Amino acid sequence: MPVAKITAALPAALDALRAEAWPVAAEGIMTTDTKPKLASTQVQVGEGSFSITGITKGAGMIRPNMATMLSFVATDLAIAPDLLHKALVRAVEQSYHRITIDGDTSTNDACTLTATGRSELPAIESADDPLYATFCEALEGVLLELAQMMVRDGEGATKFFQIEVQGGASEQECLDVAFTIAESPLVKTALFASDPNWGRLLAAIGRAGLVNLDVDKVTLHLNDVLIAEQGQRAASYTEEQGVVAMAPTDVVLKVGLNRGDASTTVYTSDFSYDYVRINAEYRT
């Protein structure tokens, strides 16, 4: 890395800083993204307020652990460093760690959170401060919005797939099921074709590694249409219902494991012809 060149350029970069430059920065970090990703919120607290703004880039190679994505977030609150770190870890776990494009990864990722302290609100020094809970909730909302933007702009994506796994024995097994479905090439290509292929969904659940899984207890809903139960196609289900359920750009799959109280949600996209083209043509 040319440290001397970077250091020499810092003064000019600092002089060029301006509050309205977030969109420029969002565009500057793009790689195979087709559009910049920027999210912001302002939260009113009594007579004062605080804001959180973030940008991110990433359209493939997102999981695990953010893979090749970059995210830069800032707030004008003043927050103790340890509390800021704890809030970021929690928010990332429920957002950037809940998405996947292709299940592939790389060694280059970063997510930073900066607190400038320019808000007129008092500094947060304790996790028991009610303002801290408000901040954590707002931060999670901004990061989840950015995470979903990445999925919607996934390489070649034509569909946004929300996978809700409920009734698991633990959150981890819910995640195992959700990500096995989300990263199945057969599921993702069926999604691209708007094919309500319940067999591929059940097959993915079956190989997710759950101990003593009773397939007869599993239920599948696509956009609220019951498509499978007791290990087979639901008696009330028709192919016409499935086609209608799969037609929208946004598709929600609800998986009922019925073996506990845990649940989680994961977001992914489909595999299209363009996904193959983009990655066949891309050169690093």
Each predicted region: which residue ranges?
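A structural signal for small-residue-enriched, beta-sheet-centric alpha/beta enzyme cores
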Residues: 1-284
